[in-house]
């Protein structure tokens, strides 16, 4: 029987698992075996780990566990988009969304219950911040989704190669600001990249940040994955209003951080995300200003039609205005995409992953709550 003080092995990346096995008097190769069982074979207990010595299995049964977050709900859209509501305890919940496409499958992962950044156009921020997720709760979203999706396709667990992988891309674009939970997010991403776990390339793991400049630099030094920046405004005055974090890290500092990051990034551009708000940030003049502020950063733009929520006081830009805005950027030679709406019928949105605005992220209030999901593309 597992003790009350057992460690959750999902909290360990490769280095952590080697250290843990060392504390049990085991050699490093045992950690690799254990990691493969957990992350490639979806093992939930130790008895079935047949290539581990029985003595080690007995040690683990007394000291360790493999504990996944509980799934509160699981919905599939008519277009194949799938959304899970994950119970993370104390009445809090986060959402994980899978977006299937012909050549890839993208998983949108949450890093916090709620968010402290409080962007004006994001309903998650309006609910306040509850807590950081643990590494186990973050990597558990990928583990849960990958093996649930494999089961739905009749595929068995196991390291069957990239052709058998269902989740081919991960975007840290769910609830929360990933760089404000750095100590848990980075080990989770290391597992995403580890060949003894999920084996994704750095180009296929994208972290989206609102612009936490010091942590962007740290990420670049320690684990440079693809980077997206939630920009949403072309000048400091407007961005101060839409993204309050800009008051601490204004655009000049943010653009400089992007330039530094590109020196080590797995891609040669930054993706700038831009929520299209009617009459707020969507004129052709704004587009030209946006080109000016980003001129020294190789980039692409991802324009996001706003998903309205109660009390936001904001309206989605009209399609024709989004098109005009995009054309200014395209005419300047910058790759520009407009994010598509996906899975309307299962209610989960970029910027609205918390569902209908409630008090914080209360699970009982949120199961089945309303929202919209829009396509999340790895970049």
From Swiss-Prot:
<comment type="function">
    <text>Specifically methylates position 2 of adenine 2503 in 23S rRNA and position 2 of adenine 37 in tRNAs. m2A2503 modification seems to play a crucial role in the proofreading step occurring at the peptidyl transferase center and thus would serve to optimize ribosomal fidelity.</text>
</comment>
<keyword id="KW-0698">rRNA processing</keyword>
<dbReference type="GO" id="GO:0000049">
    <property type="term" value="F:tRNA binding"/>
</dbReference>
<dbReference type="Pfam" id="PF21016">
    <property type="entry name" value="RlmN_N"/>
</dbReference>
<feature type="binding site">
    <location>
        <begin position="176"/>
        <end position="177"/>
    </location>
    <ligand>
        <name>S-adenosyl-L-methionine</name>
    </ligand>
</feature>
<dbReference type="Pfam" id="PF04055">
    <property type="entry name" value="Radical_SAM"/>
</dbReference>
<dbReference type="InterPro" id="IPR007197">
    <property type="entry name" value="rSAM"/>
</dbReference>
<keyword id="KW-0808">Transferase</keyword>
<feature type="domain" description="Radical SAM core">
    <location>
        <begin position="101"/>
        <end position="345"/>
    </location>
</feature>
<dbReference type="InterPro" id="IPR040072">
    <property type="entry name" value="Methyltransferase_A"/>
</dbReference>
<feature type="disulfide bond" description="(transient)">
    <location>
        <begin position="108"/>
        <end position="350"/>
    </location>
</feature>
<dbReference type="InterPro" id="IPR027492">
    <property type="entry name" value="RNA_MTrfase_RlmN"/>
</dbReference>
<dbReference type="GO" id="GO:0046872">
    <property type="term" value="F:metal ion binding"/>
</dbReference>
<feature type="binding site">
    <location>
        <position position="119"/>
    </location>
    <ligand>
        <name>[4Fe-4S] cluster</name>
    </ligand>
</feature>
<keyword id="KW-1015">Disulfide bond</keyword>
<dbReference type="InterPro" id="IPR048641">
    <property type="entry name" value="RlmN_N"/>
</dbReference>
<keyword id="KW-0819">tRNA processing</keyword>
<protein>
    <recommendedName>
        <fullName>Dual-specificity RNA methyltransferase RlmN</fullName>
        <ecNumber>2.1.1.192</ecNumber>
    </recommendedName>
</protein>
<keyword id="KW-0489">Methyltransferase</keyword>
<dbReference type="GO" id="GO:0070475">
    <property type="term" value="P:rRNA base methylation"/>
</dbReference>
<feature type="binding site">
    <location>
        <position position="307"/>
    </location>
    <ligand>
        <name>S-adenosyl-L-methionine</name>
    </ligand>
</feature>
<keyword id="KW-0479">Metal-binding</keyword>
<dbReference type="GO" id="GO:0019843">
    <property type="term" value="F:rRNA binding"/>
</dbReference>
<feature type="active site" description="S-methylcysteine intermediate">
    <location>
        <position position="350"/>
    </location>
</feature>
<dbReference type="InterPro" id="IPR004383">
    <property type="entry name" value="rRNA_lsu_MTrfase_RlmN/Cfr"/>
</dbReference>
<dbReference type="GO" id="GO:0030488">
    <property type="term" value="P:tRNA methylation"/>
</dbReference>
<feature type="binding site">
    <location>
        <begin position="230"/>
        <end position="232"/>
    </location>
    <ligand>
        <name>S-adenosyl-L-methionine</name>
    </ligand>
</feature>
<dbReference type="GO" id="GO:0051539">
    <property type="term" value="F:4 iron, 4 sulfur cluster binding"/>
</dbReference>
<feature type="binding site">
    <location>
        <position position="208"/>
    </location>
    <ligand>
        <name>S-adenosyl-L-methionine</name>
    </ligand>
</feature>
<dbReference type="GO" id="GO:0002935">
    <property type="term" value="F:tRNA (adenine(37)-C2)-methyltransferase activity"/>
</dbReference>
<feature type="active site" description="Proton acceptor">
    <location>
        <position position="95"/>
    </location>
</feature>
<dbReference type="GO" id="GO:0070040">
    <property type="term" value="F:rRNA (adenine(2503)-C2-)-methyltransferase activity"/>
</dbReference>
<keyword id="KW-0411">Iron-sulfur</keyword>
<feature type="binding site">
    <location>
        <position position="115"/>
    </location>
    <ligand>
        <name>[4Fe-4S] cluster</name>
    </ligand>
</feature>
<keyword id="KW-0949">S-adenosyl-L-methionine</keyword>
<keyword id="KW-0004">4Fe-4S</keyword>
<feature type="binding site">
    <location>
        <position position="122"/>
    </location>
    <ligand>
        <name>[4Fe-4S] cluster</name>
    </ligand>
</feature>
<dbReference type="InterPro" id="IPR013785">
    <property type="entry name" value="Aldolase_TIM"/>
</dbReference>
<dbReference type="GO" id="GO:0005737">
    <property type="term" value="C:cytoplasm"/>
</dbReference>
<comment type="similarity">
    <text>Belongs to the radical SAM superfamily. RlmN family.</text>
</comment>
<keyword id="KW-0408">Iron</keyword>
<keyword id="KW-0963">Cytoplasm</keyword>
């Amino acid at each position: 029987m597992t003790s009350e003080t057992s460690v959750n092995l999902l909290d360990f990346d490769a280095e952590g698992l080697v250290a843990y096995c060392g504390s049990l008097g085991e050699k490093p190769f045992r950690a690799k075996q254990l990691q493969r069982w957990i992350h490639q074979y979806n093992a939930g207990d130790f008895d079935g780990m047949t290539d581990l010595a029985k003595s080690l299995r007995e040690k683990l049964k007394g000291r360790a566990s493999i504990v996944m977050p509980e799934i509160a709900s699981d919905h599939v859209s008519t277009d194949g988009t799938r959304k899970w509501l994950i119970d993370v305890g104390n009445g809090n919940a986060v959402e994980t969304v899978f977006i299937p496409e012909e050549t890839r499958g993208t998983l949108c992962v949450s890093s916090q219950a709620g968010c402290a950044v409080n962007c004006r156009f994001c309903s998650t921020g309006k609910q306040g911040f509850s807590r950081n997720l643990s590494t186990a709760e973050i990597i558990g979203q990928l583990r849960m989704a990958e093996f649930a999706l494999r089961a739905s396709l009749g595929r068995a667990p196991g390291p069957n190669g990239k052709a058998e992988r269902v989740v081919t891309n991960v975007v840290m674009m769910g609830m929360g600001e990933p760089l404000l939970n750095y100590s848990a997010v980075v080990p989770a991403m290391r597992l995403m990249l580890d060949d003894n776990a999920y084996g994704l390339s750095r180009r296929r793991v994208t972290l989206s940040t609102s612009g936490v400049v010091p942590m962007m630099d740290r990420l670049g030094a320690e684990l440079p994955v693809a980077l997206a920046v939630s920009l949403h405004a072309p000048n400091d005055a407007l961005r101060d209003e839409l993204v309050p974090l800009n008051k601490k890290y204004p655009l000049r500092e943010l653009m400089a951080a992007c330039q530094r990051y590109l020196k080590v990034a797995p891609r040669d551009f930054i993706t700038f995300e831009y929520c299209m708000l009617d009459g707020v940030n969507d004129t052709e003049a704004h587009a030209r200003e946006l080109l000016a502020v980003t001129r020294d950063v190789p980039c692409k733009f991802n324009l996001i039609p706003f998903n309205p929520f109660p009390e936001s006081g904001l309206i989605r830009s009209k399609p024709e205005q989004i098109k005009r805005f995009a054309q200014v950027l395209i005419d300047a030679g910058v790759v520009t995409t407009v994010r598509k709406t996906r899975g309307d019928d299962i209610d989960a949105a970029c910027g609205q992953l918390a569902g209908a605005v409630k008090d914080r992220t209360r699970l009982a209030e949120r199961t089945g709550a309303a929202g919209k999901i829009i396509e999340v593309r790895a970049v």
